[in-house]
Swiss-Prot record:
Oligomer and partners: Homodimer.
E.C. number: 2.1.1.177
Entry keyword annotation includes Cytoplasm: yes
Organism for this UniProt entry: Escherichia coli (strain K12)
UniProt-listed Gene3D superfamilies: 3.40.1280.10
Family listed: Belongs to the RNA methyltransferase RlmH family.
Single GO molecular function: ribosome binding
UniProt-annotated location(s): Cytoplasm
CC annotations in GO: cytoplasm
Protein name (database record): Ribosomal RNA large subunit methyltransferase H
Amino acid sequence: MKLQLVAVGTKMPDWVQTGFTEYLRRFPKDMPFELIEIPAGKRGKNADIKRILDKEGEQMLAAAGKNRIVTLDIPGKPWDTPQLAAELERWKLDGRDVSLLIGGPEGLSPACKAAAEQSWSLSALTLPHPLVRVLVAESLYRAWSITTNHPYHRE
């Protein structure tokens, strides 16, 4: 199974790249993890936000293809680390690759939400999208470590 993080935005601060890459390199070869960045639409004073969201959504869904789609959204399910590890195991048994979608400043398009098989909430707080990339990578790595009895996670 391959994990994909499909995220709106292409110019992240160095600390995001450093943090994300640190966890990316830790993933085992039998569970590769990749980042697909979707260019954010231009948002200005007179921008048509619905059109921008729809276009970003189309690009995200195209990147996900036939993968299991899991959206990251505040109204999603809040999984603790053991629950995320259990989800990771279920995803592996399903046999499909998994695409986790992170929207832009206005969130995800209605099409992305409708296509999602699951929705995961990292927090009831609104988090900066660059930070979410690092949090998701670390959380998935920690969940993987539980499923393989790797010493990274300690009870």
